[in-house]
Structure formats: structure tokens, C-alpha cells
Amino acid sequence: MGAGATGRAMDGPRLLLLLLLGVSLGGAKEACPTGLYTHSGECCKACNLGEGVAQPCGANQTVCEPCLDSVTFSDVVSATEPCKPCTECVGLQSMSAPCVEADDAVCRCAYGYYQDETTGRCEACRVCEAGSGLVFSCQDKQNTVCEECPDGTYSDEANHVDPCLPCTVCEDTERQLRECTRWADAECEEIPGRWITRSTPPEGSDSTAPSTQEPEAPPEQDLIASTVAGVVTTVMGSSQPVVTRGTTDNLIPVYCSILAAVVVGLVAYIAFKRWNSCKQNKQGANSRPVNQTPPPEGEKLHSDSGISVDSQSLHDQQPHTQTASGQALKGDGGLYSSLPPAKREEVEKLLNGSAGDTWRHLAGELGYQPEHIDSFTHEACPVRALLASWATQDSATLDALLAALRRIQRADLVESLCSESTATSPV
């Protein structure tokens, strides 16, 4: 009996332990993170970051779908939330971070604006007026914070970026023309005609007393040294002070001398260039062939010997000379610019006396484009402008001009160019 009672006493705690273990296992099995269950009692699963619920659980398990980059996003783990549309930055907003599957876009106001927390709109930053300076800059959701400039500082400009600036302190060699205020800096001026000295105190003296005195003319080397140094020094420990003058008074004559030298040199250079150009033009004019215009028919040519010759009879006596010259002119391949001025004027007159489009056809044969040809019509004499422009080219040979005239059926001009101008030489 005693053993049976003891066994039953041991079964009580065992039964209680088994009961508690079963309850805990049952509770662990029933725990569901989402707190949602299907109709069959299965725990509904949640969609991860970057995924949204396409079909919530009910009769079936939860169906998830990925969010579209730059279109939708999901930044929570949920069994009910679908993908949300991305925020668009509009108006005064600019995008500081793009919209991705797991994060929305981040917008911020443009420079000079901040986002008002109450309205959510971009507002213009506050401007610190003159006499006030920046304490905290305007950015994100914070407006500009300004303060009045304290003593020793100033701000002479209204803006939202600059703090109060420290006032200028005049040097010992300067005098103050205007005090520094909250709105304007101090203004200093160099003291003219004064020497500032600092002497080494005698042995046993505790202080150095600055003094001023009228200047004496220093040697040239000392003046240059004082201009460069600009400070008072003591030579070899002597108690005699070495005085220097402000650099401004000494440098002004130097600057003026340099400026005058530059101006004179520039004027001389321009004059030399113009003289050289005129000289070259004069030499070029002298090297051109002499204008040999034909004298009127029957005019008498006089030589230094006093013998007169009839130009018409001379022309009749020398036909072979003209023929040879014409052949040389026709095929020598020389430049058009080497023709006598009278011959070029004759060609211009013949072209001017022709039909209105003759010179245009010639310009086309010489290689000019229509727009360039039209530009010659603005000149007083289009034909002269055309031939002068063409004569500057390396290809402006007489053969090229003759070939172009033949192509436009102007044999009369070809004959005129190939015929020698009537000229006589003294007998």
C-alpha cells in the first residue's frame, strides 16, 4: 500500500509538467507574425520590402508582386499593403534621391527656397538686411536665421548667405576717415608726408616711444630699400633709428613712369607699322608697268632729238611687232594683275557695255558661287569689284580669263585682250 501511494504521488507532478508542455507547444504553433489567417487556419504570409500585396489572403494564401522601379515602391513588410506610387518632384522642388522599389523619391526645394513644415510648399529664404548677418543658413526645412551685427562687425549688403564681417582696423601709418558701423566698414587713409620711426630704447629703458619728424632726402638706395621693406629697422643694433616712408607715396611716380613708357612705346610701334606699310605700298606701285595708253591716231610723237614720227605710220610699219606681242600675250600664262591699267579698264568697259548678265556668267566661270556674285552688286562698279577680287587669287592668270571668256561666247573680249595697245617708242 505504501509503495502504491508513493507512485500515485509522483504521477501528479508529471502530469502537470506534461500539461504545461503541451500548452506551450500549442501556443508556439498558433503564433502568427501577421495576425491574419486563411479560411483553413493557415497564417497569412507578409510581402517583403520592395513587394506589394497583389491579392490578400483569404481563401488562398497572400499573393505578392514586385514594385516597379521609379513608378511604385513599398517600404514596409506587410500582408495587406500594396505598392504605393512614387512621389513626383514638381514646381520649385528638385529630386535629391530617386524612387526605387523599396524607397520613395526624396524631394527638396531649389536653391534659395526651403520647405515650410506647415504647408509643405517651397518658400523663398529670408534675406538678412544690411546691418544683419547670417547665423543659420536656409536649407531643407529651415529658413534663414539672421542676427544684428554686434560691435566690431558690419554687413553692408542684403543677402541670405553672408555673416557679419569684422571691421577694418586702421594701421599706425593711417588715419580713420569713417568709423565702422553695423551697416558700413571703417575707412582709412594713408597719412601723407610723415615719417614713422621706432627707435631702439637705451639700455635700462622699459618702453619704446614712437615719434614723427619731417623727412630728409634719403639716398636713392635707401629710398628703394624703404619702398620694398615699408617698415622701420635698426642698423647693426645702433640706437639711431632708420626711418622709412609709406610705400604709396614712393610707388606712384614709379607707376606713372611705367605707364608713360608703355604708352610711348605703343605709339612708336603703331607709327613704325604704318610707315612700313606705306613704304611697301609705294614700292609696289613703282614696280608696276608704265601705263602705255595709245595716243590718238595721227598724233606726232616727239623724241629728245626733235624728230617727230606719225603714230599711224609707225603702226603701219610694225604689224609684225603687234602680231608677235599678241601671240605672247595670248599664251604667256602671266597674271591678270600684270596687265597695264589701261588694258584692264578697257576690259571693264566692254563688260559694262554688255548685257546685264554677262559679267555674272563670267563670275560663274571663274569659280564664284551665286551668293558671292550677288555681293558684287552692292559695289559701285560690280565688274571692277569682280575682277579686283579675282586678281588676288593665285590662279588669276590671263589664260584662265581668256578660257572663261571663250566659254561665255565673248570672242570680242578675247580679241581685245590679245591685241596689243598701240604704243610707240622714241626714235
Swiss-Prot record:
* Stretches assigned to the Cytoplasmic side: 273-427
Renumbered to this chain, the Polar residues biased-composition regions fall at 197-214, 281-291, 305-326
Q: Which CDD domains match?
A: Death_p75NR (cd08311), TNFRSF16 (cd13416)
Modified positions (Phosphoserine) are S311
The secretion signal range is 1-28
A GO CC term attached to the entry? extracellular region
State the UniProt keywords alphabetically: Apoptosis, Biological rhythms, Cell membrane, Cell projection, Cytoplasm, Developmental protein, Differentiation, Disulfide bond, Glycoprotein, Membrane, Neurogenesis, Phosphoprotein, Receptor, Repeat, Signal, Synapse, Transmembrane, Transmembrane helix
Q: Which residues are glycosylated?
A: N60
Q: Which Pfam families match?
A: Death (PF00531), TNFR_16_TM (PF18422), TNFR_c6 (PF00020)
Q: What domain of life does the UniProt record list for this protein's source?
A: Eukaryota
- Annotated localization: Cell membrane; Cytoplasm; Perikaryon; Cell projection, Growth cone
Q: Which GO terms describe its biological process?
A: axon guidance; cellular response to amyloid-beta; central nervous system development; circadian regulation of gene expression; detection of temperature stimulus; dorsal aorta development; extrinsic apoptotic signaling pathway; fibroblast growth factor receptor signaling pathway
Which terms does the record give in the GO molecular function aspect? Answer: amyloid-beta binding; calmodulin binding; coreceptor activity; death receptor activity; nerve growth factor binding; neurotrophin binding; signaling receptor activity; small GTPase binding
Chain intervals for the UniProt region annotation (Disordered): 194-219, 281-338
PANTHER family membership: TUMOR NECROSIS FACTOR RECEPTOR, TUMOR NECROSIS FACTOR RECEPTOR SUPERFAMILY MEMBER 16
What does this protein do, in the record's words? Answer: Low affinity receptor which can bind to NGF, BDNF, NTF3, and NTF4. Forms a heterodimeric receptor with SORCS2 that binds the precursor forms of NGF, BDNF and NTF3 with high affinity, and has much lower affinity for mature NGF and BDNF. Plays an important role in differentiation and survival of specific neuronal populations during development. Can mediate cell survival as well as cell death of neural cells. Plays a role in the inactivation of RHOA.
- This protein's name: Tumor necrosis factor receptor superfamily member 16
Q: What would be the name of the gene that encodes this protein?
A: NGFR
